[in-house]
Amino acid sequence: GTGLGGLVSEIDIKFTLSYEQIPHFPVSTVEGHSGKLIFGYISQRPVIVMQGRFHYYEGYTMQQVVFPVRVMKYLGISTLLLSNASGGVNPAFEIGDVMILNDHINLLPNNPLMGKNIKELGPRFPDMSEPYDKKIIAKAHGIAQGLGYNVHEGVYVSVSGPCFET
């Protein structure tokens, strides 16, 4: 997400692919998004890192926006961590605080689950009773606090943009 480009220096990079090298991969038009898929290790754990993402407001379809996640699923990822910069409506939050999602509200006009269901990617209607893993939330909370960040949990509202989500 915005502001986390320095994380790349923590990766033991084995190889990178430019998005242009990957068939059907969208290319980000947002300044500062370098457009690379990085394969490597962080603390001996294999990772795939997107250096730049695509936004619905750039004119891509929802299927194009989620295509990279689907590719990574086929490559064998079992855990997906996402980050971004967003606005907020909670007056207790300050610029630079970290918010870990415990739920979300989708106000986008389209849904990536529309269209033909691909069974290998999951069910037509995923269980949304607990959309975010509580163990991962707790671990992320502890790590962020240990690094000195003000940490909150909250509900993310996704909007089409172009503006920061809340």
Predicted regions and their residues:
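Glycine-rich loop at the start of a catalytic domain that most often binds anionic cofactors/ligands
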Residues: 5-19, 93-97
